[in-house]
């Protein structure tokens, strides 16, 4: 098996098994499932109660803004962990001040972004 495509064989087998499983599941659901359609089955299910009113409720855009800011700063903070864990390794392999200065610049850019958010009063609820 010196073929250049031989290493892709397990992936192809897994893909075929997955597609086969999906096909068998959908086909058996279609064959064994109930065929009777009624108006009651087309209604929305809301914890056993009949739905009342409009499902569209308006709420403040602040929730989206806070969620976006949380995700933004949370993802950036995730970059701190690998840096902190590997700081000693980087200090031995490269100049330790170089890595420290780069992380300091990264933290400064985060701080500038956070100051911008505060100055724009994005976190004020009034």
Swiss-Prot record:
Q: Does the keyword Transmembrane helix apply?
A: yes
Annotated GO MF terms: NADH dehydrogenase (ubiquinone) activity; NADH:ubiquinone reductase (non-electrogenic) activity; quinone binding
Give the transmembrane region(s).
Answer: 11-31, 64-84, 98-118
Return the EC number.
7.1.1.-
Annotated Gene Ontology cellular components are: NADH dehydrogenase complex; plasma membrane
Keywords (alphabetical) are:
Cell inner membrane, Cell membrane, Membrane, NAD, Quinone, Translocase, Transmembrane, Transmembrane helix, Transport
Q: Name its cellular compartments.
A: Cell inner membrane
Q: What is its main location?
A: membrane
Q: Which InterPro entries match?
A: NAD(P)H_OxRDtase_bac/plastid, NADH_UbQ/plastoQ_OxRdtase_su3, NDAH_ubi_oxred_su3_sf
**Similarity remark:** Belongs to the complex I subunit 3 family.
Cite the PANTHER family for this sequence.
Answer: NADH-QUINONE OXIDOREDUCTASE SUBUNIT A, NADH-UBIQUINONE OXIDOREDUCTASE CHAIN 3
Its biological purpose? NDH-1 shuttles electrons from NADH, via FMN and iron-sulfur (Fe-S) centers, to quinones in the respiratory chain. The immediate electron acceptor for the enzyme in this species is believed to be a menaquinone. Couples the redox reaction to proton translocation (for every two electrons transferred, four hydrogen ions are translocated across the cytoplasmic membrane), and thus conserves the redox energy in a proton gradient.
Q: How does it assemble?
A: NDH-1 is composed of 14 different subunits. Subunits NuoA, H, J, K, L, M, N constitute the membrane sector of the complex.
Q: What is this protein called?
A: NADH-quinone oxidoreductase subunit A
